[in-house]
Structure formats: C-alpha cells, structure tokens
Amino acid sequence: PHNGKPLPLDSREMLAFLAYLKWINGFTEKHKEYKGEKPLEIEFIDRKESSENGKILYTQHCVRCHGANGEGQMQFDDVTYVYPPLWGKEGYQPGSSMHRVIKQAQWLKANMPHDSATWQNPVLTDAEAFDIAAFVNDDAIHSRPNPKTLDYPNAVEKAIDYGVPPHADTFSASAHKYGPYKPIIKYWKEKGLHPKY
C-alpha cells in the first residue's frame, strides 16, 4: 500500500494498471456511455446511518475477508493484499473517496460480499450498505493513516458526505458524514447548488 504516495512509473503495480486500462479501453467506444459506468443507484435512508448496526453486519458479511480488526489479508508474498485493510495504519486515508459513506455504500451494494453479490443481483440492502459504510468509516473507533485537514479549499466542491469541515451549508460535520442526506441534498438544490456524492 502506498497510502496516497504516487506509484513509481516502472513499478509492477503501475504496469498492471496501465495494462488493465489499455485492455478495458478496447471494449468501449470513446465518449459514449456504457453499462456499469456510473455507481449503482442507492436509495437514501430517512435516518442517520448506524455504526452500531454496521458492526453487526460487518461481522456477518465482511470479517472473513477483511478481518475482525479491518486488517485485510496479505498475499503469500507478504507485500500486497488479497483483501485490503479497511482501517489502521495500512488502511485508506481520510481523503479517499471510500472514506465517504455514500460512495462506499454504493460500491458495497454492487460488489460485496465479493463471492455472492453482483451489480445485477446485490446481496446487501441499501440500509445495510449504508450502515456497514458508516461502521467502516467511523473515525471515533478506527484510526486512519496520515490524517488530512485541508482536502478541499473550496467547500462548494466538496462531496456532501465528506465529514471534514468547513462545509458550504449549516449542517453539522456528523450529518455530512453519517446523514441523513436527503435534507442536505434538498438544501443544496434549493440554493441552486449541485450536491456531489
């Protein structure tokens, strides 16, 4: 894990990324939308996400691959991961898009558990995906590497589920991180702003 540091251009990982991008680019026409391009739609729930319920769901659906302490599972080479760590010193940073509850919930619904969920047939409900994302991203119980404080110099460009202030509205940092999101989206639209998530 490089934790936000650029990969060396000639590294095995960078060459793998480039090979994959070249390969996948061969399946789509340029400047044309394609199935799976956008995140799976997810219905916002009318309550704050529950980290407590997310912990129970994490134990049911996620522990076997990502570990009880979010440590992930290393490959045999002890350098890379089969299943990535979700928090701790090797986890993703606060500035990562996966550290945003809405973004992670969309991804979880479409992809997890990896051996049973598909984009067409999700396993998790919308509420379950939101609660697991809230638990995994709960900074009160999970540490992250290299905390950042000024990721977005312009608050209007910040995603509404990014929990670090300042924000372009009067909602609390907790509301931005854990919802409910419908009132925030409504407020932004009423002000003529485009909410990002």
Language-model regions: role of each:
Residues 25-59, 64, 73:
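Electrostatic cytochrome c docking/interface patches
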Residues 32-36, 67-84, 118-122, 147-150:
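Short acidic alpha-helical/loop segments enriched in Asp/Glu that coordinate divalent cations
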Residues 1, 24, 28, 68-72, ...:
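A short secondary-structure junction motif
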Residues 45, 49, 56, 77, ...:
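A short glycine-/small-residue-rich loop at the edge of a beta-strand within enzyme catalytic domains
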Residues 1-6, 17, 81-143:
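Extracytoplasmic electron-transfer domains, predominantly the class I c-type cytochrome c fold
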Residues 2-18, 22-26, 143-197:
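N-terminal export/targeting leaders of redox proteins
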Residues 17, 54-73, 86, 132-136:
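The canonical Cys-X-X-Cys-His
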Residues 8-18, 36-52, 125-134, 153-164:
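Amphipathic alpha-helical surface "interface" segments used
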